């Protein structure tokens, strides 16, 4: 298996790098007023893939922080995956043309699965499905609404569609540093024939050690946010742990 990828997250709100608690836009903490500088710092530290989310875009249903994303793309040379407000093929292709490596489709995976399949067929290896769940049920529209559909049922829709990975976020843990919900994430990974990325709650080296255990072998990696920003997770220690697996 390829080494586990740690994706440092840059969530964009009003052009700033922020972290939310449980997806609540009213509970946003600004961590860097210059997201491109933050991206450059992550690259310098040795991260090999960035995870970007246009939070305003997720709520608006269209890109809002495009200028900030474009500055990041101009600044770093490592791959970037981007989600938030991407609801049609034109927007997917515009971002791919601007240098985004992988596009994350979340709400669209619930609302318009045929579009997701169309995008994955047109751009194999470049479409990721983002499943954000409360108690195993998928939330949409920037987490403002929770559906009655189980995450695993949606994931199974895309097994043979050309989707390259699933990001599974446990909303109840996101931004709270309570630790990854590895049980639910591993259960999803074992139920579908797709790589799965863990997200929500990563708090310490112990979480990364858990990613390196045999039970987590189907996980492509994990997204880390607040723990990096507030210093609970030392980037170099985390990357060294992954590199030494």
From Swiss-Prot:
Broad enzyme group: isomerase
CDD domains: HisA
Alphabetized PANTHER family for the sequence: 1-(5-PHOSPHORIBOSYL)-5-[(5-PHOSPHORIBOSYLAMINO)METHYLIDENEAMINO] IMIDAZOLE-4-CARBOXAMIDE ISOMERASE (PTHR43090:SF2)
Alphabetized UniProt keyword annotations: Amino-acid biosynthesis, Cytoplasm, Histidine biosynthesis, Isomerase
One Gene Ontology molecular-function label: 1-(5-phosphoribosyl)-5-[(5-phosphoribosylamino)methylideneamino]imidazole-4-carboxamide isomerase activity
EC number annotated for this UniProt entry: 5.3.1.16
Pathway noted in the entry: Amino-acid biosynthesis; L-histidine biosynthesis; L-histidine from 5-phospho-alpha-D-ribose 1-diphosphate: step 4/9
Signal peptide: none
Keyword Cytoplasm: yes
Catalyzed chemical reaction(s): 1-(5-phospho-beta-D-ribosyl)-5-[(5-phospho-beta-D-ribosylamino)methylideneamino]imidazole-4-carboxamide = 5-[(5-phospho-1-deoxy-D-ribulos-1-ylimino)methylamino]-1-(5-phospho-beta-D-ribosyl)imidazole-4-carboxamide
Organism lineage: Bacteria, Pseudomonadati, Pseudomonadota, Alphaproteobacteria, Hyphomicrobiales
Any Pfam family hit: His_biosynth
Primary subcellular site in the record, as a coarse category: cytoplasm
Superkingdom: Bacteria
Subcellular location as annotated: Cytoplasm
Annotated Gene Ontology cellular component terms: cytoplasm
SUPFAM superfamilies xrefs: Ribulose-phoshate binding barrel
Active-site residues per Swiss-Prot or TrEMBL entry: 11 (proton acceptor), 132 (proton donor)
HAMAP family on file: HisA
The protein's name in its UniProt record: 1-(5-phosphoribosyl)-5-[(5-phosphoribosylamino)methylideneamino] imidazole-4-carboxamide isomerase
Family as reported in the entry's similarity comment: Belongs to the HisA/HisF family.
GO terms (BP aspect): L-histidine biosynthetic process; L-tryptophan biosynthetic process
């Amino acid at each position: 298996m390829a080494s586990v990828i740690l994706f440092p997250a840059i969530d964009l709100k009003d052009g700033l790098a922020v972290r939310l608690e449980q997806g609540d836009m009213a509970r946003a903490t600004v961590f860097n007023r210059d997201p491109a500088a933050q991206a450059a710092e992550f690259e310098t530290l040795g991260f090999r893939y960035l995870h970007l989310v246009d939070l305003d875009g997720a709520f608006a249903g269209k890109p809002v922080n495009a200028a900030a994303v474009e500055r990041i793309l101009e600044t770093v040379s490592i791959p970037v995956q981007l989600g938030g407000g991407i609801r049609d093929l034109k927007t997917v292709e515009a971002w791919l043309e601007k240098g985004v490596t992988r596009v994350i489709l979340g709400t669209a995976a619930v609302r318009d699965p045929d579009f997701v399949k169309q995008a994955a067929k047109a751009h194999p290896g470049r479409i990721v499905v983002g499943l954000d769940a409360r108690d195993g049920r998928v939330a949409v529209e920037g987490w403002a609404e929770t559906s009655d559909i189980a995450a695993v049922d949606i994931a199974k829709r895309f097994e043979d569609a050309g989707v390259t990975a699933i990001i599974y976020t446990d909303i109840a843990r996101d931004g709270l540093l309570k630790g990854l919900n590895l049980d639910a994430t591993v259960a999803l990974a074992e139920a579908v024939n797709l790589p799965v990325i863990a997200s929500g709650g990563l708090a310490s080296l112990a979480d990364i050690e858990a990613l390196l255990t045999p039970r987590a072998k189907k996980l492509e990696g994990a997204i880390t946010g607040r723990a990096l920003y507030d210093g609970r997770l030392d980037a170099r220690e985390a990357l060294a742990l992954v590199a030494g697996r």
